[in-house]
Amino acid sequence: MSDFDSNPFADPDLNNPFKDPSVTQVTRNVPPGLDEYNPFSDSRTPPPGNVKMPNVPSTQPAIMKPTEEHPAYTQIAKEHALAQAELLKRQEELERKAAELDRREREMQNLSQHGRKNNWPPLPGNFPVGPCFYQDFSVDIPVEFQKTVKIMYYLWMFHAVTLFLNIFGCLAWFCVDPSRGVDFGLSILWFLLFTPCSFVCWYRPLYGAFRSDSSFRFFVFFFVYICQFAVHVLQAAGFHNWGNCGWISSLTGLNQSIPVGIMMIIIAALFTASAVISLVMFKKVHGLYRTTGASFEKAQQEFATGVMSNKTVQTAAANAASTAATSAAQNAFKGNQI
């Protein structure tokens, strides 16, 4: 009670046990109850310090972005462009064939009106001898066979040039070896003989076979061309005293003179090339022959028809028949008189 009698001007909390600093510190740390909650008080917690977050590696999203594809209309446009280009190409080819057929038709009309004039060999107008054959690949030969016929024509020319060079090769060999006069003479004979004969005997039948689809002419070509191939092989071999600068003759000439031997080796290589190309083209022509529908039966029919329609044969048969009839009538008349 003595405390109540103390100085009224003294601090009232001085002796208050609830104002003890240790007690107030504990009570301050206790969270306030619901009855002491004040919604208007500033109860925000202080912001946390700068906390370092762990580095998380970036991952791709769960939904992958689809790859970029060309839209469907682009593919359609490309296909349409390709189809249009193919159509244009076919149209150009058809127009080219139509123009070629038109040109051939006009040429055939001109030939029917003015007649077909021979144009091969191409000789000058003032030459005493005129052309002997008519040759025009674009007019006579179908388009699919023109290349083959032209190659055979160039092969004939190649062999003719080789025979011409063979003359000079044998002449050079004759100059270094006087005993080779026989080869030099035969080389001239082979050039004068084989050049026209090969043109008439196998090239013209081939030309006519493709022109008129003649089975008989195909068989004539095959028979003669086999012989021609054998000639090419013999010329490439070059036996002595046969008039050919083949491999055997070239080696002999090389032992006598190196320049002459080299010249003869070149000619032997040309003969060998002729033989190889001839074999290849024979197979090609035979393959084309099988696609044309030609046969041995058709060849027999064409031969029989050609023989019977030949004016010379008809005249000879008529003369033979008239002679036989006359002799028979005379014998019968003599028998009646006896």
UniProtKB/Swiss-Prot annotation:
The modification Phosphoserine is found at S2. Keywords: Acetylation, Endosome, Golgi apparatus, Membrane, Phosphoprotein, Protein transport, Transmembrane, Transmembrane helix, Transport. Residues 177-181, 239-261 are lumenal. The chain crosses the membrane at residues 156-176, 182-202, 218-238, 262-282. It holds the Pfam family SCAMP. InterPro entries: SCAMP. The modification N-acetylserine is found at S2. The keyword Acetylation applies. GO terms for cellular component: membrane; recycling endosome membrane; synaptic vesicle membrane; trans-Golgi network; zymogen granule membrane. The modification Phosphothreonine is found at T45. It comes from the Eukaryota. Residues 1-63 are annotated as: Disordered. One of its GO terms (biological process) is protein transport. It is a multi-pass membrane protein. Its main location: Golgi. It is found in: Golgi apparatus, trans-Golgi network membrane; Recycling endosome membrane. Residues 2-155, 203-217, 283-338 are cytoplasmic. Signal peptide: none annotated. Interacts with SYNRG, ITSN1 and SLC9A7. Belongs to the SCAMP family. Functions in post-Golgi recycling pathways. Acts as a recycling carrier to the cell surface. This is Secretory carrier-associated membrane protein 1. It comes from Sus scrofa. The gene is SCAMP1.
